Amino acid sequence: MDHGLEIATLGGGCFWCLEAVFQQVDGVRAVESGYTGGHVSHPTYRQVCEGDTDHAEVVRLTFDPATITFREILEIFFSIHDPTQLNRQGNDVGTQYRSIIFTHSEAQRAVAEYVIGELVANKVYDAPIVTQVEPEQPYWRAEMSHQNYYQEHPAQGYCAFVISPKLAKFRRDYSHRMRR
């Protein structure tokens, strides 16, 4: 990894949704879909979807904190998924879709807890936030068919009806954070 870059690992529903948004964020150098938080080494998509591994679908971001801070990444993260839904996002149901932040340092943990505290204090959501904050765990890259999914399949039904609206919301609310 390049000197000065940091890693963020986030789960908030299907990793295709998060991947598509964060690929457009200025300062995010790389986005990779994968699995973490479970007890099986090298899990497959099928195993994770069957719910037998306890893994979450996540994106692992490599970002330049001089361009975008971890806090700003979390602000985008909380705007593109519903952190009040336990083990689901919309019609995607299961523990693999849980809202979770895997932190890579004590500083990230503190920022994550602070941002969640602000959201609660400001009553941004009507229901309790269920986002978990946990230290990083072994991470496994998802299969190639899950990398760059939206870019490869923009007309696919899930992409058109679930991911495209999230991208539109991101572009509307965070145009200043988009890559130029």
Predicted regions and their residues:
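Flexible coil/turn and secondary-structure edge motifs
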Residues: 1-180
